[in-house]
Structure formats: structure tokens, C-alpha cells
Design a protein with these regions (language model features):
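Terminal low-complexity interaction tails
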Residues: 107-129
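Short recognition patches in nucleic-acid-associated and regulatory proteins
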Residues: 39-63, 68-110, 117
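Short, intrinsically disordered terminal segments enriched in charged and Pro/Gly residues
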Residues: 1-68, 121-129
Length: 129
């Protein structure tokens, strides 16, 4: 039991290191979109085909510190290797100065032997100079 716990801790630490590396490689958001003054993302995650176990929150981006990386973890605790990377869609929309845009993406993770069935829907609002 202790070995399994230790393995989980090491996996978590490795994921954090990988996340920092991806953030560093992405650069800063204000460098990619210099005239951006605010960004908020309304995130709504559901199971495909249903409304059970919904997750809904608003992510307000702190521009001074934000990497040009938009990854969201899957909220299903059983999901392995899942989550959503909406970086390209959001950066593309911000670079073209869109004030409001939305999108969705299915989780690519697995819950045991089956595919994760969660879907992320997001609405982003942005302001520019």
C-alpha cells in the first residue's frame, strides 16, 4: 500500500514538472497577444449525453503571470491521462481580437477500461486596448 501511494506521489510530481515545462515552452500570454487587457473563461464540463456530475466555473486569467497555455484537467477522479488542451483555439481567437468565442472538446482519457465520456464547453470573453 505504501508503494502505491509513493508511486502516485511521484506521478503527481512528474506531472507538475511537465506542466511547468509546457508553460515555459508556451511563453507568456501578454507576449503573444500584447494588446489584451482581460480574459475570462466560463467552463462547463458534463458527461456526454447527460447533465449528471456537471462542473461549472469561471476562470479569470491574471495576464501579468499567465502562460500562453490553456489546459483544463478532467474533473472525473477516475479519469487517467485525460483533460482538455484548448490552447490553439483560444490563442487563435485572441490573436484575431475576438471579444467572445466558444468551443467544446471531448476528454481523451480513460476511466478503467472505457473512454472517459466528459465534454468541456467553454465561452471566452476578452477585451483589448
Amino acid at each position: 500500500m505504501m508503494n502505491r501511494r509513493r508511486e502516485k506521489e511521484l506521478e503527481l510530481k512528474e506531472r507538475r514538472v511537465q506542466r511547468v515545462e509546457r508553460e515555459d515552452a508556451a511563453g507568456k500570454l501578454v507576449e503573444r497577444v500584447p494588446d489584451l487587457t482581460s480574459v475570462s473563461i466560463s467552463i462547463h464540463e458534463t458527461r456526454a449525453g447527460g447533465c449528471t456530475s456537471d462542473t461549472h466555473y469561471i476562470r479569470r486569467v491574471v495576464l501579468e503571470h499567465a502562460p500562453a497555455l490553456f489546459e483544463v484537467s478532467c474533473s472525473d477522479p477516475r479519469c487517467e491521462d485525460g483533460g482538455y488542451d484548448v490552447t490553439q483555439e483560444i490563442i487563435r481567437a485572441l490573436a484575431s481580437r475576438q471579444a467572445r468565442f466558444e468551443g467544446q472538446q471531448a476528454c481523451q482519457g480513460r476511466c478503467g477500461s472505457i473512454d472517459c465520456s466528459r465534454v468541456l464547453r467553454y465561452v471566452t470573453t476578452a477585451t483589448y486596448q
